[in-house]
């Protein structure tokens, strides 16, 4: 039989979907931007809209920045793991991210060096095994081996990269 295509969201020119997840059971969401900000906001502030609509603004974006991640925060979450394109990362205690309203810039989550950008703000418990994905390889790391530091610090190098290599993402390993 023929399959009907359903439009999930109306996108403006140049927009793309970064993440999608069910919100049932989650109270908070972490939204990260390329310039190193992370907004923790209540799922309740993101009102349901119809399928063929643009939706609501999650995070206010400064010029030349874009959303890199949007992840649910579970009750068991203890930290936000910030990871950059150049492989720097760290854990920051969740309580350092006071929940704010949507359509605000959030908190500076990591200090970026020239040319670096945030790849992900990943809510974690602190005992997970993670996979860092670069343009050339993957590296498994234990969350427990990543240093904890305040929000606006650089963190430490989590993966060795050669020229023209960069981090594209991080996921919790199964």
What feature does the model see in each segment?
Residues 1-174:
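Short, structured "edge-of-domain" segments at secondary-structure transitions
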């Amino acid at each position: 039989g023929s399959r009907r295509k359903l439009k999930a969201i109306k996108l403006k020119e140049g927009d793309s979907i970064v993440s999608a997840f069910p919100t049932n059971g989650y109270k908070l969401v972490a939204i990260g931007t390329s310039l190193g900000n992370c907004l923790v906001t209540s799922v309740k502030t993101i009102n349901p809209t119809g399928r063929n609509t643009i939706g609501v603004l999650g995070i206010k974006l400064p010029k030349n920045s874009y959303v890199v991640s949007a992840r649910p925060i579970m009750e068991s979450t203890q930290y936000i793991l910030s990871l950059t394109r150049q492989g720097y990362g760290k854990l920051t205690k969740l309580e350092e991210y006071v929940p704010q309203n949507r359509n605000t810039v959030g908190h500076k989550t990591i200090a970026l060096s020239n040319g670096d950008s945030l790849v992900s703000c990943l809510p974690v418990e602190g005992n997970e095994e993670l996979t860092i994905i670069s343009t050339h390889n993957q590296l498994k790391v234990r969350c427990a081996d990543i240093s904890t530091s305040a929000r606006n610090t650089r963190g430490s190098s989590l993966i060795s990269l050669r020229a023209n290599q960069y981090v594209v993402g991080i996921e919790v390993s199964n």
